[in-house]
């Protein structure tokens, strides 16, 4: 059966970090609740933006190592398209213990929670605010934590956006290399090499320098080292792609996997995608993008997140972009996840796609002509009767 390929123009945006800017200048203050919540495995700093709306889930974020919720997510959540989404949802930002701004050093002998224990702290956070369910957004270590939380508590997670997720335990060779690097390499360099690819370190010098300065000047080095050790000691998530007639451990909720094409996490994200239910999973690869797509490509990620949420049935069609409405009206279709059906681009069941910029919005553009290529993740159509994950490149 033939499949239609659709090219969609995408407008790029200027980097959010310009020369001379600092992380502080990028972060806008919110009128929010901030609390240190006691859980089974210690205290965790939580920031709740907005008021939870009835039975609707909240968007819960978890950051990567070397970051906190502000440096990891504020540039994305301050972007205008994302603010359109957050009008419909409260947002709960979780900072890993000791990673928030101004965090005090842990006492000598403090046992930092394991990655599994960090995930086990989240039910207490939801209980504190009276929250029943979440749409999770995690990056790196945070993506691992939210995935573990969803595996343990599937009834609490309605969807996951996982940026740079690595489902595997660190191999013993990687572990040894990280230990040796710890003896010879400064902590900021270790974190920067985790966050950014080699190409990006040369092409986006100012961005890398900005985050390096944040790590040096704003992060508590002892606390950060404990968080890094916890991440490097993570267990394999032991997830498997479900097969008919077998019982496997995998995510039960829809998942959007996101990675930049020059990110150091590309291979890990592709590996994770191969272990998830292809009928519920979309892999979004961002072209000309490094390790932090939420920083360098907020427009694309916000649009993908909008369609992801609409596919879960939450945002009304009035919130769809002009392009999305026109495609819905015309009944244009895209190859479905099982490779055998076509599906209209409605707000129900829509997978992540990016769009041309609307003339009514004010944005800064640096280049034009990018396109969206929608293809099945593995194998050609007709060669495999089984379902295929959808891979979206933009």
Swiss-Prot record:
Sequence repeats, residue ranges: 339-348, 349-358, 359-368
Bias kind Basic and acidic residues: ranges: 345-371
Cysteine pairs bridged by disulfides in the record: none
Residue span of region 3 X 10 AA tandem repeats of G-[PST]-R-S-R-S-H-T-S-E: 339-368
Compartment(s): Cytoplasm, Cytosol; Cytoplasm, Cytoskeleton, Microtubule organizing center, Centrosome; Nucleus; Cell membrane
Subunit structure: Interacts with RAB4A (membrane-bound form); the interaction involves NDRG1 in vesicular recycling ofCDH1. Interacts with APOA1, APOA2, PRA1 and RTN1.
Function (record text): Stress-responsive protein involved in hormone responses, cell growth, and differentiation. Acts as a tumor suppressor in many cell types. Necessary but not sufficient for p53/TP53-mediated caspase activation and apoptosis. Has a role in cell trafficking notably of the Schwann cell and is necessary for the maintenance and development of the peripheral nerve myelin sheath. Required for vesicular recycling of CDH1 and TF. May also function in lipid trafficking. Protects cells from spindle disruption damage. Functions in p53/TP53-dependent mitotic spindle checkpoint.
Protein name as it appears in the record: Protein NDRG1
């Amino acid at each position: 059966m033939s499949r239609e390929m659709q090219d969609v123009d995408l407008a790029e945006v200027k980097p959010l970090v310009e020369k001379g800017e600092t992380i502080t200048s990028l972060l806008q203050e919110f009128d929010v609740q901030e609390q240190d919540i006691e859980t089974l495995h210690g205290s965790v700093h939580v920031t709740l933006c907005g008021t939870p709306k009835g039975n609707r889930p909240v968007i819960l974020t978890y950051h990567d190592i070397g970051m906190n919720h502000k440096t990891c997510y504020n540039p994305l959540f301050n972007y205008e398209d994302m603010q359109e989404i957050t009008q419909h949802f409260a947002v709960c930002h979780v900072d890993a213990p000791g990673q928030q701004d101004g965090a005090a050093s842990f006492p000598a002998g403090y046992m930092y929670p394991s990655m599994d224990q960090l995930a086990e702290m989240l039910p207490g956070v939801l209980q504190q605010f009276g929250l029943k369910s979440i749409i999770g957004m995690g990056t790196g270590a945070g993506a691992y934590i939210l995935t573990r939380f969803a595996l343990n508590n599937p009834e609490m997670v309605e969807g996951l956006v996982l940026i740079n997720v690595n489902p595997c335990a660190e191999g013993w060779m990687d572990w040894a290399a990280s230990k040796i690097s710890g003896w010879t390499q400064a902590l900021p360099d270790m974190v920067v090499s985790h966050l950014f690819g080699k190409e990006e370190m040369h092409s986006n010098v100012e961005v890398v320098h900005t985050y390096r300065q944040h790590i040096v000047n704003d992060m508590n080095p002892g606390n950060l080292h404990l968080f890094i050790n916890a991440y490097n000691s993570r267990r394999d998530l032991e997830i498997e792609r479900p097969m008919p007639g077998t019982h496997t451990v995998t995510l039960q909720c829809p998942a959007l996997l996101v990675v930049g094409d020059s990110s150091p996490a590309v291979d890990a994200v592709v590996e994770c995608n191969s272990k998830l239910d292809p009928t519920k999973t979309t892999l979004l690869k961002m072209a000309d993008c490094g390790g932090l797509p939420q920083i360098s490509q907020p427009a694309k990620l916000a649009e993908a997140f909008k369609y992801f949420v609409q596919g879960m049935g939450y945002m009304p069609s009035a919130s769809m972009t002009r392009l999305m409405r026109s495609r819905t009206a015309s009944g244009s279709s895209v190859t479905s996840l099982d490779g055998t059906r076509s599906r209209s681009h409605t707000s129900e069941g829509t997978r992540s796609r990016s769009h041309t910029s609307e003339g009514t919005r004010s944005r800064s553009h640096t280049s034009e002509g990018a396109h969206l290529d929608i293809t099945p993740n593995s194998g050609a159509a007709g060669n495999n009767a089984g379902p295929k994950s959808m891979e979206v490149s933009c």
